[in-house]
Structures are given as structure tokens and as C-alpha cells.
Amino acid sequence: MKNKFLATLFLACSISTVSAQTPVYMDDAQPIEARVKDALSRMTLEEKVALCHAQSKFSSAGVPRLGIPELWMSDGPHGVRAEINWNDWGYANWTNDSITAFPALTCLAATWNPDMSAKYGKAIGEEARYREKDVLLGPGVNIYRTPMNGRNFEYMGEDPYLASVMCVPYIQELQKNGVAACVKHYALNNQELWRGHIDVNLSDRALHEIYLPAFKAAVEEGGAWSIMGAYNKIRGQHACHNDFTLNKILKDDWKFDGCVITDWGGAHDTYEAAVNGLDIEMGSYTNGLTSESVFTYNDYYLANPYLQMLKDGKVPMSTIDDKASRILRLIFRTAMNRQKPYGSVATEEHYAAAREIGNEGIVLLKNAPVIKKGAPLLPIDAAKYQNILVVGDNAVRLLNQGGGSSELKVKDMVSPLDGLRAVYGDKVAYAKGYAAGRPMYGRADEIPQNVVDSLRAEAVEMAKKADLVVLVGGLNKNHFQDCEGGDRLEYGLP
């Protein structure tokens, strides 16, 4: 009995000693704010500054000396993007980074169902966690100012209230996986053409009633852990280091305690980035560096230039302490969160969620009978139609491939043509009908007129012999359509 007592006492003392030796910042039982304060007190100025800028295309540094890990980010918001190379935009060609492609956020918003938003956030969060991402760059909540915006498909429509309601469950469920939402693009990034140069001027009423409500809901109701700054200027100052929108509105008025992260290449000035609310700088092309070169990350605005300004007393030390505190808080919530689940990817549950969201988001304008007083056309009666013609490039195009940063590498995808053939078999014929060109970023194919005429003529002739024609049209992720970096040139469909 005495030996058992001594053994128990020794074990208790050992646990107490280990606990006493564990730094506060490493102790999960301590409040996050206490951990942030303790970690900050142990860091050098150089280590604090190193937190504030990229170390690769999609990661920022931790503090190796203290065992604090780096942050890994991934494009979203419709799925976790395939792995990108360390220093350039090329794909790493991994064989294990395929995921589920979820419907576009426009489709999610069209469900008008917050439960669908919660399912979306839960599933995409599990996939991001499985892929060991700490920050998912989404959801996008910019308002449709015009239907010509090439990136509208990434957003939740033109209604500020709808976007506000729908983004909250997405964020909450995503972050339950220990993955931060990075709500984008804050703010007023409502066109792609010249997005890095335009200066947006608007009234306070338009700003607060139309363009900011979804961001405000994301912060105050959704509890978003990070925000992505936009490329454009707002009232003369770049959005990624805009004193009015970042310091005054986001951090003071809304009490945002997370990180502001640039869109890639969105920083332009060290002093403004230091004092106007930017926390992490990603993807900059400073000092002659281009998107094709190996980046010297220490040349970033919030790297050595910022460090030197701090040492010279040109910016207050309080700026780096605030930035480092916010970044540490984000790391403790994500990369150092030992309670986060393992995650999963491309599961039947995720496929079912994507299918359910897609079904609820379908907008059927009209399901009229083919003949007066007859039955509605849909669903297609296999016994009635023996020769079904499918027309359209989108019937065979995988729309997850293209669109810029939102393009995805899927584990499995069924095209509309394959889906119809799976049900109706050899009754289904196909004609392309038109040429859309390849889905490319920054440029578009020019289609010769003789090709256009030939494809149209073929489809017309085949349609004359068909009992039923199914046209699969719409935009197709090409540049100057629904693709990052360019806006639509016309209202018409290809």
C-alpha cells in the first residue's frame, strides 16, 4: 500500500513538473490570448517580421526556434486547389491531391437555404483539413455590381442580405475543422479588368448598405479568422493597406481579431502596409521580380524593408506586435490546434452534399409540355424519344478546369453527355454546335469562321433528324467569360 502511495505521489509530482515546464504558448489548456502574449514575449524582432510575409507561393513562416509551425493556404472557394509549386504558379503534379468539386457559390446562393451552406462548409472544411491546409481562400462574398464581372460565379449574387445569410454557416462549419475561412475580396472588387489599378469612389450609404454587409456578417456572425484584401483602390488607397476599410471599419468598428491577408500581389507600399492594417503579404512581385522568377521573399514590402523601418523608428513597434499577435492567434486556431479532426476527401458523403446543393440550386425557368395540355417535358420519357441529340461544347467540357484560381483537380467527374448516355444509352447522339476554345487564363482562342460555320451546320442537320434536342450552353470558364483576370465582352452566350 505504501509503495502504491509513493508511486502515485511520484507520478503526480512528475506530471506537475512537466506542466510547470511547458511554456504557456504550448499549453492547450491556456486561453489563446495568454498563449499569444507568451509567444510574443519570446520572439525576436526578426522572427515577428518573418511571420508577416510569404515564404513560398502558398505558405508563410512560423517560428522554428519556438516550435511554432508555418501557415499553409489553398485557393477555394469551391474546392481545395491542386498543389502548387514552391516558387511559381505551376502545378506540382502530385498524384494524391484530387478532391470534390462543389457547385459554384452562385449555385449555393440560389438554394436560399442556409442548411445547404452549412453542408458546403463542413464538407469543404473536411477536405481542406485532410489536405493539411490551415487557411482556405474563401468564401467570396463580393456583390454582383454588373453581370459582366468575369468572377461573378465565385460570389453569392447581387443581394447583400442573401449573401450575408448564406456566408455565415459556410464559415462556421469550415472553421470547425481547424481551417480558417479567408473571406474575399475585401472590398469593392466588382470587376476584373484593371482590377489592380482602378480606384473605386462611392457614397458611404452604398458602401455600408450594398457592398459591406456580407463582410460584416462574416466577421460579426460567422467569426471569420481571416480576410483577404482586394486588388483595387478605395478612395485613392489600395484595399490591401487601406486605413479606412481595414483599421477603421474592419478592426475598430467590427472588432475583427483575425488576420488581413493580401490577394497575391496586392501590396504596394511598405509604410502603408505597416500602419494601415495589413498583416500577411502574399505573392508580391517586388524589386523587379515577376511571376516567372524565383521569389526573394525577403524583398517583400513587409519583409526586410519593414524590418529596416522598424529599426529606424519610421514606424511604431506597436504595428509589428499587433500583426504578430494576430498571426499567432491564427496559428493557434489552425496549425497548432490539436483538437482539429483529421478530415476526409472525396467521400460519398461529400459527393452527396455536392449533388444535393447542386439540385437545390438549379433554377428551372419553365417545364412546359411539348404539346398543348400534354405532360411536362421533364423528366425525359425514354419510351417516347428514340433519337435524342445533345448539342453544346459544355456537354463535354469539365467546368472545374479553368476560371483562374478556382480551377480544381477532381477525383471523379461526369459530364452532361455521359450522364445522359448512362440513362438513355445509344439513343443519345452528340453535336458540338459551336467552338468555345480552350479554357485559358489571360487569353482566349480565336476561332476561324469556317470552323464556326461548319459546327453549326452539322448541329442543324443532326437536329432535323432528332426527336428531341437538348442544348447544353452557357459560359465555359474561358477568358473574357467567367474567368479570373478578365470581364465578359458581351452579354451573349458563346
Language-model-detected regions and their locations in the chain:
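Bacterial Sec-dependent N-terminal signal peptides
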Residues: M1-P23
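Glycoside hydrolase catalytic-domain context in secreted enzymes
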Residues: A20-P494
